[in-house]
Amino acid sequence: MFNYSGLNEECGVFGIWNHPEAAQLTYMGLHSLQHRGQEGAGIVVSDQNELKGERGLGLLTEAIKDDQMERLKGYQHAIGHVRYATSGNKGIENIQPFLYHFYDMSVGICHNGNLINAKSLRQNLEKQGAIFHSSSDTEVIMHLIRRSKAPTFEEALKESLRKVKGGFTFAILTKDALYGAVDPNAIRPLVVGKMKDGTYILASETCAIDVLGAEFVQDIHAGEYVVINDKGITVKSYTHHTTTAISAMEYIYFARPDSTIAGKNVHAVRKASGKKLAQESPVNADMVIGVPNSSLSAASGYAEEIGLPYEMGLVKNQYVARTFIQPTQELREQGVRVKLSAVKDIVDGKNIILVDDSIVRGTTIRRIVKMLKDSGANKVHVRIASPEFMFPSFYGIDVSTTAELISASKSPEEIKDYIGADSLAYLSVDGLIESIGLDYDAPYSGLCVESFTGDYPAGLYDYEANYKAHLSHRQKQYISKNKHFFDSEGNLNV
């Protein structure tokens, strides 16, 4: 999606165990995950004696410079992180991995997602005397681990993971092991890879494994954690109260098209969603164009299904930072003009089908429609390769209030008029589920579609009161007419 006024991804995590150039490979892995966050990056390394780290603000190349990388050489194990702030402010103190030095051990930790009970946990911990050095929810898990009475670090980790709620993955490093963990719904992805020399890798996406020439080993599934050390790799469960609900937005927008999630290639899923969208909402036109970059696969599928030319009517400046993930509305809107331009010779006098992957606030797609018409387009029919984004997300996407969502208060017809399109149609929820093609024995075939349905598989917890207080009339109507599988604590409704 190129909706600069829209969604923001959470983060990307990476880990590697037992390689003489651990920091350098981590840097490469993080580079392939840069699309998941641009506000900051960090790397923590370890050997059998110590842990040390470097971090900074900005893109990876800005955050960790050559002199910092020099200081990380010579260590065999590492974790790394690229950040977009979904909780906590945007200062250096919130850049991960966090590194803790205790009297008996040192620990590095980084996190992708959002802990929806972090506020209440933090309040309880502070009442017990805990001191926090950041506003990030990631720090909560470390306090829980250290306050555990469990006899080993692994047992303390398991106990702590059972206390936190939300959509998350963790990568944790000690001098003895590399740990990874996934929430009880597997909302956020985590995969394991293995290099030819036996080195194990953890990553948010398979693209970070592929870039190092490693082989995919397995997904870490709902409620599982992995331990990687000199003895090898072990995958265990920390809870059996699991219901798979993989974030549909990973497929729709966040993941790279060359990544594979739960056995489904992201590009193939997006193309299938475009085909399904064409079946559900065809329209007469001269051509199909996609909004660069993540909508291009869906646009090609739409064009192929409907039998129209697929043209490059919009050009993206590849050398500007991914402004969509910029933290302020003003920067996102300025980014539209800097990053995107219409190809006048292609669109002039034509009836266009414009495919995008979602509409969140609506301001960016409105600018794009105007840009195309200013360049001579006769008609612009907007087709969205996902359902209406009607409900906030609390699991690691930075759209956590109803006020941010145009579909929460406006009908498709009203949105069509607002954005200046000649027609507007969305992919149905059933069409999305079919396009992705998961077959888990779970609601929505194992997808988390909370932003389209208001059905929250991990519950609401700290967000519940505010969420319910601000439900719009349109949201309430949708909820009353559609079955919900989960209650406010993420339990399956019987």
From Swiss-Prot:
Manner of cofactor binding, per the entry note: Binds 1 Mg(2+) ion per subunit.
One GO BP: 'de novo' IMP biosynthetic process
Binding residues for Mg(2+): 294, 356-357
Active-site residue list: 11
Keywords linked to the UniProt accession: Glutamine amidotransferase, Glycosyltransferase, Magnesium, Metal-binding, Purine biosynthesis, Transferase
Pro-peptide region(s): 1-10
Residue stretches making up the Glutamine amidotransferase type-2 domain: 11-231
Pathway the protein acts in: Purine metabolism; IMP biosynthesis via de novo pathway; N(1)-(5-phospho-D-ribosyl)glycinamide from 5-phospho-alpha-D-ribose 1-diphosphate: step 1/2
MF GO annotations: amidophosphoribosyltransferase activity; magnesium ion binding
Record field: catalytic activity: 5-phospho-beta-D-ribosylamine + L-glutamate + diphosphate = 5-phospho-alpha-D-ribose 1-diphosphate + L-glutamine + H2O
Known cofactor(s): Mg(2+)
Signal peptide range in chain numbering: none
Function: Catalyzes the formation of phosphoribosylamine from phosphoribosylpyrophosphate (PRPP) and glutamine.
Family: In the C-terminal section; belongs to the purine/pyrimidine phosphoribosyltransferase family.
NCBIfam families in UniProt: purF (TIGR01134)
Protein name (database record): Amidophosphoribosyltransferase
Lineage start: Bacteria, Bacillati, Bacillota, Bacilli, Bacillales
